[in-house]
């Protein structure tokens, strides 16, 4: 009985971990950390023609597209969205999970600025 409970708990933990995948860890071929501090993590993302990633997630982010490109995003529920993105385009992305794919015949590159969770502001000092 105890062994079964331990196995069940381990399976739940592994399933939860698999659902919350960091792009840099699960797909280092396409995702490179350029800069990181307590407020943001800045990623350079590069896909060759017709390359795709694996399912992963990002926090709320701002994307800056460096090249034109055609892409397809698949969400965990199987829905897909196709887009044509232009060099210089800037886009807000809510936090979420997806599997991205470069559907074009040319390399596709962007910078993604991931926002880290904000801490509550410190209380101002008060005079005594």
Role assignments for model-derived ranges:
Residues 35-39, 77-95:
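Short acidic-glycine-tyrosine-enriched beta hairpin
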Residues 27-54, 59-63, 113:
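A short glycine-rich, His/Asp/Glu-containing loop-to-beta-strand
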Residues 58-77:
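Glycine- and acidic-residue-biased ligand/ion/polar-headgroup-sensing regions
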Residues 50-53, 89-101:
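Histidine-centered metal-chelating micro-motifs
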Residues 68, 95-118:
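Ligand-binding loop in jelly-roll beta-barrel domains
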Residues 7-15:
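Bacterial N-terminal signal peptides
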Residues 1-4:
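Positively charged n-region of N-terminal signal peptides that target proteins for export
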Residues 16-20:
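Sec/Tat signal peptide C-region and signal peptidase I cleavage site
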């Amino acid at each position: 009985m105890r062994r079964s409970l331990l196995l069940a708990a381990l399976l739940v933990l592994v399933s939860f971990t698999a659902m919350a995948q960091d792009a840099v860890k699960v797909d280092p071929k396409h995702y490179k950390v350029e800069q990181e501090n307590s407020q943001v993590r800045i990623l350079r993302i590069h896909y060759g023609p017709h390359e795709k990633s694996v399912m992963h997630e990002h926090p709320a982010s701002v994307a800056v597209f460096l090249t034109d490109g055609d892409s397809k995003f698949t969400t965990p529920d199987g829905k897909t969205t196709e887009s044509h993105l232009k060099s210089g385009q800037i886009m807000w992305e809510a936090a979420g999970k997806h599997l991205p794919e470069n559907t074009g015949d040319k390399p596709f590159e962007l910078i993604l600025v991931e926002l880290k969770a904000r801490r509550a502001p410190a209380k101002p000092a008060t005079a005594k």
